[in-house]
Amino acid sequence: MKLNVDGLLVYFPYDYIYPEQFSYMRELKRTLDAKGHGVLEMPSGTGKTVSLLALIMAYQRAYPLEVTKLIYCSRTVPEIEKVIEELRKLLNFYEKQEGEKLPFLGLALSSRKNLCIHPEVTPLRFGKDVDGKCHSLTASYVRAQYQHDTSLPHCRFYEEFDAHGREVPLPAGIYNLDDLKALGRRQGWCPYFLARYSILHANVVVYSYHYLLDPKIADLVSKELARKAVVVFDEAHNIDNVCIDSMSVNLTRRTLDRCQGNLETLQKTVLRIKETDEQRLRDEYRRLVEGLREASAARETDAHLANPVLPDEVLQEAVPGSIRTAEHFLGFLRRLLEYVKWRLRVQHVVQESPPAFLSGLAQRVCIQRKPLRFCAERLRSLLHTLEITDLADFSPLTLLANFATLVSTYAKGFTIIIEPFDDRTPTIANPILHFSCMDASLAIKPVFERFQSVIITSGTLSPLDIYPKILDFHPVTMATFTMTLARVCLCPMIIGRGNDQVAISSKFETREDIAVIRNYGNLLLEMSAVVPDGIVAFFTSYQYMESTVASWYEQGILENIQRNKLLFIETQDGAETSVALEKYQEACENGRGAILLSVARGKVSEGIDFVHHYGRAVIMFGVPYVYTQSRILKARLEYLRDQFQIRENDFLTFDAMRHAAQCVGRAIRGKTDYGLMVFADKRFARGDKRGKLPRWIQEHLTDANLNLTVDEGVQVAKYFLRQMAQPFHREDQLGLSLLSLEQLESEETLKRIEQIAQQL
């Protein structure tokens, strides 16, 4: 259908539209008109992706000079594929309506691991190995040697792409990862470099967060993207953690021991080259005097190690004299390494700021701040000069150089914590240095400054006003949308007591209480008897899940549960979890029914949708607070309090509730889907917790369902499931939660749509 969204003609590839989709597009258009940033919370399963794509594509076509590109960031590869398929549908609809092929290019970009087609590289399992092997086949000096001696290993796909792929742009169309690989095989071109080259002239690029937020990768991949682009971060409820991880470095004793080995290898290589080809080192010295910008204007294939920080002015300066020659630089790194090793010999926890660390460094081993800032770039230049092919081996030293560059660049927003042992094993000496970023806005600031509109969107962003604070930006629109339903298909409830009236909670004091554990077991047992097909249960941590399940086993509860449904458990091993998921789905398909026990913040809670019968009930055992004794977390809470005036308790509750909402939101993946959302902890009923749930869940959480016993909860569930078992046809939805074009244009409907969005 063709829609008029505030004067913009939007092609929408379906015959019917949800009212909230129309409302969402309106808010989106206002954001683009204002050339500002937006925070939008849209219920899960209501067609967020297609609304985003339809509106932004229409905007691109109406104002081609205002918005030149859409950069769509998603978290996992399956999500990226989903976005590309929606885009394909949309483009087909455009072409059908206009009767001609459009000069439109949309493509997905992922790591070499997902795109490489070289027969020697594809069997490798880990991304780091794939990148290293690829580099050893495509580095500029490897290719130069190949020109003289064709028997040397090389990558024919990259050679072919380099020779012919750049002149011929990708034909218009939509390409997912498999399409790129198929094209690569047909033409003999490397799909990874083809995709990286093509994102410059694509209309839509879909890739993972790290390509924009991790400065080491963004510098290589996203540097050339135009300012007049719209950036969308989908499923962005965790975006602050992604920012923080991309800027943090952990150094263990093992890493430092391997650095030692790396330095010795480099020392030998430098001596060997000095004897055979001293000119090469002299050339490098000359380049470094001219400035790093020249040194790093090398080939794209060598840029495997990027700069971990953002300031470009470092690259314009000449490298300090003390680290220009290779030997001096290696000596410099050795002194730095010795100092960090010495700092790890601690008996108690040390916490200090980067300036304090630097002053200690200057006093002990006379290393000044300025040369440290050049460490990462200088190492990159050295590895290039020495023609090191297997870069994966040098990752420990690269990590140390990244740490040096970061610690000397940022004076605030970071903290250094040195722990002599892991809290869980206090008897084993296992020292670790955390260089921890506490300010999420550091990594995302360049994105907000560079692109004219950035949209942060997800199903669980409540409370909305905390995101602009912790990411330090000023949105022009902030809105949360309700879910218009012809039948109420979600049933949230809070179970706060067992049948014996014992309050149930996962808080630390009552965690080991046998009565609480028994009541949790009874809840799962009774729910497994009334809920059809699949139940997903989330615990607050792996440790808590293991101890609870062990107690259930001793009490004989597990045996009773297994009479009703089969049990599957998520573990920390990715492969095991995948098998458990597969079998869980099989049991649901066969009608045997299954229960999946998993963990909030784990793999299952983040990226897996339990559509229809795969998730008829989600039970959240306890409030998923993060481990509050962690020193890194304490430092971050202190920083948030001082910098952004966010109280510690507010942030912890916000963090726990966004994860709880993320877990229970897995059950509802569309309006024809239905499911129970059981919050099993008396603390959920408090105003500060309940008020932080997304609006679309809060609306259906009635006062009657606030502090139920297990039996009362089961009665509510039975009643709800009986309602849901009645036949439900598309006709029942029409006019209410599904609108045709005529219905959408009626005044009454437009008035109703006004109320869906709640601006903040």
Swiss-Prot record:
PANTHER family xref list: DNA REPAIR DEAD HELICASE RAD3/XP-D SUBFAMILY MEMBER, GENERAL TRANSCRIPTION AND DNA REPAIR FACTOR IIH HELICASE SUBUNIT XPD
Protein EC: 5.6.2.3
Protein name according to UniProt: General transcription and DNA repair factor IIH helicase subunit XPD
Result when mutating R616W: In XP-D and COFS2
Ranges spanned by the short sequence motif Nuclear localization signal, renumbered to the chain: 682-695
Cofactor binding annotation: Binds 1 [4Fe-4S] cluster.
Record: disease: Xeroderma pigmentosum complementation group D: An autosomal recessive pigmentary skin disorder characterized by solar hypersensitivity of the skin, high predisposition for developing cancers on areas exposed to sunlight and, in some cases, neurological abnormalities. The skin develops marked freckling and other pigmentation abnormalities. Some XP-D patients present features of Cockayne syndrome, including cachectic dwarfism, pigmentary retinopathy, ataxia, decreased nerve conduction velocities.
Motif interval(s): DEAH box: 234-237
Post-translational modification: ISGylated.
Catalytic activity reported: Couples ATP hydrolysis with the unwinding of duplex DNA at the replication fork by translocating in the 5'-3' direction. This creates two antiparallel DNA single strands (ssDNA). The leading ssDNA polymer is the template for DNA polymerase III holoenzyme which synthesizes a continuous strand; ATP + H2O = ADP + phosphate + H(+)
Comment, domains: Interacts with GTF2H2/p44 via the C-terminus of this protein; mutations in the C-terminal region of XPD do not alter its helicase activity, but prevent its interaction with and helicase stimulation by GTF2H2/p44.
GO molecular function: 4 iron, 4 sulfur cluster binding; 5'-3' DNA helicase activity; ATP binding; ATP hydrolysis activity; damaged DNA binding; DNA helicase activity; metal ion binding; protein-macromolecule adaptor activity
Subunit structure: Component of the 7-subunit TFIIH core complex composed of XPB/ERCC3, XPD/ERCC2, GTF2H1, GTF2H2, GTF2H3, GTF2H4 and GTF2H5, which is active in NER. The core complex associates with the 3-subunit CDK-activating kinase (CAK) module composed of CCNH/cyclin H, CDK7 and MNAT1 to form the 10-subunit holoenzyme (holo-TFIIH) active in transcription. Interacts with GTF2H2 (p44) which stimulates the 5'-3' helicase activity of this subunit. Component of the MMXD complex, which includes CIAO1, ERCC2, CIAO2B, MMS19 and SLC25A5. Interacts with CIAO1 and CIAO2B; the interaction WITH CIAO2B is direct.
Annotated region described as Mediates interaction with MMS19, given as residue ranges: 438-637
GO cellular component, one term: cytosol
Activity regulation behaviour: Interaction with GTF2H2 (p44) results in stimulation of the 5'-3' helicase activity of this subunit. DNA unwinding by this subunit in TFIIH is stimulated 4-fold by XPA and 20-fold by ERCC5/XPG.
CDD domains membership: DEAHc_XPD, SF2_C_XPD
Effect of L485P: In XP-D; the corresponding mutation in fission yeast causes complete loss of activity
Record-listed ATP binding positions: M42, P43, S44, G45, T46, G47, K48, T49
Zinc listed as a keyword: no
Free-text function comment from the UniProt entry: ATP-dependent 5'-3' DNA helicase. Component of the general transcription and DNA repair factor IIH (TFIIH) core complex, not absolutely essential for minimal transcription in vitro. Required for transcription-coupled nucleotide excision repair (NER) of damaged DNA; recognizes damaged bases. Sequestered in chromatin on UV-damaged DNA. When complexed to CDK-activating kinase (CAK), involved in transcription by RNA polymerase II. In NER, TFIIH acts by opening DNA around the lesion to allow the excision of the damaged oligonucleotide and its replacement by a new DNA fragment.
Activity response to pH changes: Optimum pH is 6.5 for both helicase and DNA-stimulated ATPase activity.
